[in-house]
Design a protein with these regions (language model features):
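Short beta-strand elements
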Residues: 109-129
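Short beta-strand element of the alpha/beta-hydrolase
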Residues: 184-186, 194-204
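Surface-exposed, short loops/turns at beta-strand junctions within beta-sandwich domains
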Residues: 91-97
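Cap/lid segment of the alpha/beta-hydrolase catalytic domain
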Residues: 207-268, 276, 324-334
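Proline/serine/threonine-rich low-complexity linkers at boundaries of modular beta-sandwich domains
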Residues: 20-28
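Alpha/beta-hydrolase fold nucleophile elbow
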Residues: 283-293
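Hydrolase active-site cap/lid region
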Residues: 297-347
Length: 355
């Protein structure tokens, strides 16, 4: 009984501390003066900066801020003191793009960040990256060559992950070379019938996957894949070791060759995942979607563009976009190859145009 009472007191203390922390939390709020965040070229945008503590403006707070085109600020100031906890900043853009206001507040030895980004004539944005003349031909031939390697799929039931409506498996299949596999988590409705399918492609990183039994339980086949050619049900420590070791910065591997690029095998793997789904007897042969965010958003767009069997697409803030925007000092998509890794040589430029 004493142990139970002691545990109860500990829980009360934790709750009290949590409430106190939340009540005193610091927030940096940056707001543009258009509710839709969209502006005409040359129109002034006024950002209101507020530093709040417990929902009240914090006086005499010190901030740093950057203002200008996304990733290329033209106004940078440090150690600005806000006497009443608020500040108004103005900017504009003469060409289509995004104006960003980024603020860091320094309070009691800690740094808190906030930002807002307004759009200037976003519908007028045009890609800088050039489309190679042989783009589709290259990928058609690459996939044709990959398909000479049979899928040889393997499926292992995961009883602990099965639900009332769906069976869940770890699956793997060959992609472009003997022994080279993609791994993922497959969910198939238990009820006999033909079903639509959804392919989930991942954001950047190295991690395990749980699969998708929640989007439409018992009504859709789902396949959530990893891209690194390793099982997706191992201990987290394995993925952490790989992320910090052999797969650290994997997105830079093979940057000098379209064939050796790390993403060559990844794109082929995503397309072979479509092959695998289409081989399932439970697939209805009519409705196949692909979705993902960031790196997964890019892979969603790529997969849908290169495979006509994909009938619907949902890409969330896709990465790997317009790498050559760097040359016009305009933000490109992650991983911002030339922004972080220096000016490219011609081979690197040729390579990124295929990804």
């Amino acid at each position: 009984m004493k142990r139970v009472f002691s545990l109860f007191l500990c829980l009360l203390c934790v709750c009290a501390v949590t409430a106190q922390i939340r009540g005193n939390e610091i927030r940096v709020v940056v707001s543009p003066d258009h509710s839709d965040w969209v502006y005409r070229l040359n129109e002034k945008c006024t950002f209101t900066v507020r530093v709040l503590k417990a929902q009240n403006l914090l006086s005499d707070v010190k901030i740093d801020y950057e203002l200008g085109p996304e990733m290329y600020p033209t106004e940078v100031k440090k150690d600005v003191v806000l006497k009443d906890g608020t500040l108004k900043l103005q900017g504009t853009m003469k060409t289509a793009g995004f104006l960003r206001c980024k603020v860091k507040a320094h309070v009691d030895g800690r740094t808190y960040e906030g930002l807002a980004t307004s759009a200037y004539a976003p519908e007028q944005l045009q890609p800088v990256t050039k489309l190679p003349a042989d783009f589709r031909d290259y990928w058609a031939k690459t996939l044709e060559e990959a398909r000479k390697t049979p899928l040889n799929p393997l499926m292992t039931l995961l009883p602990e992950r099965c639900t009332e409506t769906d069976n869940v498996y770890q699956v793997s299949f060959q992609t472009k070379a003997w022994g080279g596999r993609f791994y993922g988590i497959l969910s198939i409705p238990k009820k006999e019938g033909k079903y639509p399918a959804l392919l989930r492609v991942p954001g950047a990183g190295v991690r395990p996957y749980a699969g998708d039994t929640y989007t439409a339980p018992g009504k859709v086949i789902t396949l959530e894949v990893g891209i690194h050619g390793i099982p997706v049900t191992m201990q987290q420590s394995v993925y952490d070791a790989l992320a910090g070791g052999a797969l650290s910065n994997y997105w830079t591997f093979g940057r000098d060759s379209r064939d050796a690029s790390y993403y060559n095998r990844v794109v082929v793997g995503a397309l072979r995942a479509v092959d695998f789904i289409c081989s399932l007897p439970q697939y209805n042969g009519k409705a196949l979607g692909v979705t993902g965010s960031s790196q997964g958003g890019a892979l969603s767009v790529i997969t849908a563009a290169l495979d006509s069997r994909v009938t619907f697409l949902a890409a969330v803030h896709p990465a790997l976009c317009d790498h050559e925007a760097f040359f016009k000092k305009r933000a490109c998509g992650w991983p911002h190859y030339f922004y972080y890794y220096g000016a490219p040589d011609e081979k690197q430029l040729e390579t990124v145009r295929y990804y």
